[in-house]
Amino acid sequence: IPEIAKERIRRAGRKIKEESQLTTQDLDTGFRVFRIDSGNYKNVTMQPNEYDQQMLDLFVDNIKADRTDLDLLFGAMLAWGVQLSLPMTTEEVDGCKIYAVDGNGLVACFAENISENVVQTMAAKQPLRVLFRDSCFDEDKTKINIFERFKQQLDWDEKEAIQNIRVV
């Protein structure tokens, strides 16, 4: 049934484009398809007697290996109550992909060891919310510095920054 529905939507989009009087405009008839899946995170909740010192490296990254940037982005959007139908753009800076949802509603980057230029580009968008993956930062002090930069540049107090900046 989902495949039939997707094909009908594609055909309807083509028909609308063919019959549209707006031939000079790029008419967007695209759509997103979602499926229900398990969460993006590994279960790392264990009792102290269930693991040993050699296993600690297994818990460095709590995100499941098969998850994509978009999985993380849409998961965060759901958690924040942000509509999944909002427009989204991507921009590449220093080899890192930056996602912007609804203009400046949510700005995210999941690349490893992001550069100062990436952070500056994200902050310049004056986002309402910011999302990073923990592996974006090579050290905790880098994470703290970026947190403080967003607070300063966006004129957020501590509480606003904690609410609006997430690291997954």
Predicted regions and their residues:
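Accessory, often C-terminal, charged low-complexity segments
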Residues: 1-168
